[in-house]
Amino acid sequence: GDSYPFYALSPSGTLAYWTGVAGGAGSAELVWVTRTGEVTPVDPGWEFNPGASEVAVALSPDGRRAAVKIDTEAGEDIWVKQLDAGPLSRLTFDPGLDRRPRWSKDGRSIIFTSDRLGDGYDLWIQPADGTGAPRVLLDLKEAILEVDQPPDESMFVLRLGGLAGATGVRDLVGLRAGDSITAPLAAEPYDEKAAALSPDGRWLAYESTETGRDEIYVRPFPDVNNGKWQVSSQGGINPRWARNGREIFYINGDGSMVAATVSGTGGFEVTGSQPLFSVNDRNLSNGANYASWDVAGDGRFLMIRTGGSDDEGVPNEFVLVQNWLEEVRARLRR
């Protein structure tokens, strides 16, 4: 999957690194966030390790359960949390990397990416209640790193490519159920990612770097060549639709959650836009290439807050250590 180093070491021995948020990757909690930015822990006292490289949470269609990627000594697995303060159960048990969960439209199964076959990331599905064995849903030549589906689940919208921080190779493609040949949806010489279909399946929102930075775009679906609209103008990542289809939420270049009001009954039109709250100031996680949060039917956001419940919002710091190798050698000689 996509992962990014938090440090760099030069040949001359200078070390540069980000300190991260107080509490580290092993301390995080699931929270509800209102449109005004009020943060409330889902289950006070419950903390978990979301993993150092990426976080992911997906809300079930009925809003009663959350699928969360949790990193333990056993590996990165998908767990299911009963909301709000209900039990937590482990869903996947393979030592491979199980990531980026999505719910089936009927809420009975969870779809996720996994490298457990050893040939890159494939798409897997497993009953959400833990019964039955997981099975491969799609095994393509390219790595599958994201998925979404329209309401009738007749097609897969997939993001292919882009491992280890590569740029310009992330593409969105469509694959009809039962077919083996993908068709390009947004596959141009820059990165297209974070695919999000509208609740009625008529519109595809995604982020693209075609202007030189990530912005949010919308195209008709599945006939993507019949139009294209730019939703954001000050940077945009992680598009998510409101469950009524009347808003697109995304995080702008300043790290603020933005609500764009849209009309898609006839053609598509953005009729308004307003920032809601700062994601960065509240230590709320967001993925660079996919939406790592979700939206409930009542308009609240289900997000992961890093640093734990006692964290006071200590920001990341960039630290430069000169002659780091010499210091290490000196300590080893002691």
Residue spans of the language-model regions?
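Conserved beta-propeller blade repeats
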Residues: 1-18, 45-69, 93-115, 139-162, ...
